[in-house]
Amino acid sequence: MAGEKKTEVVKIMNKKILAAALTATMVGSMFSTVAGAEEAKNIPELTTEPMEIVFWHHSTEDPSKGIVERAVERFEADYPNIKVTMTAQQNDTYKQQLVVAMSSGKAPNMYIHWGGGPMVEYYKSGFVNDITDMFNTYDHPDYIDAAVAQASYDGKVLSIPYGGLSGCDIFYNKTIFEEVGVEVPETIDELEDVCDKLLEAGYVPFTLANGSKWTGSMYYMYLVARHSGNDEFNAAYAQEDGGSFTSEAFIWAGEKIQDWVKKGYFNEGYNSLTTDNGEDRALLYNNTCAMMLQGSWNVRNFVNDSQEWTDANLGVFRFPEDAEAREKGVPQNVEIGTAIGNGFSFNCWKEDGSVDQEKLDACYVLATQYFNDDTYNEEQMTLAQAIPSIKGYEDKIEDPRMQYVADVFFNASNVQLWYDQYLPASVTEVHKNCMTELFGLDKTPEEIGQEQDVAMQAALAE
């Protein structure tokens, strides 16, 4: 049986879907009316002299890799004097290498990030151009307000939204649920009942690849949000008026996670598996696990691995509510995610420290006109199952799972940005290590709360 499972996983993980190979000309033009009719654009006039843009991103596999490359190809075709030198690395490696590059003073001219605290620190360290005036002067897509807000800091626009909306929901195997006779849970108590029945039937409830650390944080974030809305996190972030990562909601969330660990709700070896390699999805494919709490970008990964398996088995539901907190008036529609997915920031400077405006102009045009044109957005939606952070696109979603994610996102009272992106970079590392310790039962919720408090206080004092 184990051999059959391994063979099936290899088949699924290596299977390439036809859609990933489609070129821009093969994708329908059903979204052409969103951006409006073609007309003269108000964009910077770019240099005709030879120029190189060093561009880093994290799209290492199709379909996203091809979408990025084709956007750059369209730009280079229109501006043949400008060469875009691209480097792509997987998420966790990318983050590490970007910090290394900045530490050595060799950061790329254009790079993606996840917004939040790290973006602010990149800016304060001198690796982000302030593009407020350009954003207010030149054409750009009609981004949703939340995306512009997330791309900004202290009244300054510091990045161009890229990648689209990303929610966080529970993906599940509908076939297993039907076999076991369980329904989609609406409350955390019901979720625990489902998990117990799955265990009795021989299935591990959740697949988790917490070697990436931020994956475990999703459970922590949602449990805190369901128990207290945004209030306790906001207070802990400010470290004022008694705010602390040891407050009631954080302790409750940590204890709940450790209780789930002890009950066997997660797969074996979860702290050593990585999500970049799809090791969490593999445990869904071989029927070891029944559910996975993850970002909505995984719809693309599921389809890319196997359209057939996805259509036959994959369902999605929002993180269940805390019934007791709801009775106390705590909002239950705070969702975890991001309004921009990623942002493009620019690092264009001359040797004397002044802004290299010609290169900055070129980066701005590439980011706003080629990574956000009709072709790019069509491919994002049809090939990558992404939801552009641009007004009007939410009505064009065809994939039912992504439509569900979008509905949850747009009906949220508030969208909490991932802790590992919202927190200052120094606190983020502490937080992620705390997730390893929490899920590993190495430290108590109180102990990791104290560690995060110390890190937050140090960051605020800088």
Regions found by a protein language model. Give the residues of each.
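Short, solvent-exposed loop/beta-turn-alpha elements that line the ligand-binding surface or hinge
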Residues: 44-46, 130-143, 183, 227-252, ...
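Extracytoplasmic "Venus flytrap"/periplasmic binding protein-like
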Residues: 74-152, 175-186, 282-283, 290-291, ...
